[in-house]
């Protein structure tokens, strides 16, 4: 399964919007990391994806951009509104060296009714994470970022 990782910049969102049918036909599942406070372009891209029934993963704890320190607007202005009736998406949660088990558990508890995908990017406590995740059947995917591909 191919998961193109997009930072949610204007050109990337236009690409998603204009190629939603192609993504659907190819079975690709894009991962979108929102970086801009203005969610209107992202909403347009999501509208195109939903028309073609394209599944996607929306990162809710971005490591870059305007939502890096406050992702609450992603929930209040997008997930709980625009996406509330669309079932073909997962909340994506990045687990890396900055992540804590307490934050991960809190996120899972807060989103027990939603589909979750974990984006693994060098999280150092894999065994402890596995113990936390075993209690949650809403975790649908684990995607691992290859450190070599980031250079």
Identify the function of each model-found stretch.
Residues 11, 19, 38, 53, ...:
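Detector for Asparagine
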Residues 27-104:
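An N-terminal, globular interaction/scaffold subdomain
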């Amino acid at each position: 399964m191919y998961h193109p990782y997009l930072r949610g910049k204007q050109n990337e969102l236009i690409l998603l919007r204009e190629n939603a049918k192609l993504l659907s036909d190819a079975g690709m599942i894009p991962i979108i990391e929102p970086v801009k406070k203005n969610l209107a372009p992202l909403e347009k891209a999501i509208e195109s994806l939903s028309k073609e029934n394209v599944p996607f993963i929306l990162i809710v704890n971005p490591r870059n951009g305007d939502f890096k320190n406050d992702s609450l607007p992603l929930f209040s202005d997008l997930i709980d509104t625009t996406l509330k009736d669309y079932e073909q998406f997962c909340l994506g949660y990045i687990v890396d060296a900055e992540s804590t088990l307490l934050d991960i558990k809190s996120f899972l508890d807060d989103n027990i009714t939603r589909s979750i995908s974990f984006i693994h990017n060098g999280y150092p406590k894999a065994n402890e994470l596995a113990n936390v995740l075993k209690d949650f059947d809403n975790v649908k995917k684990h995607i691992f970022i290859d450190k070599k591909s980031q250079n």
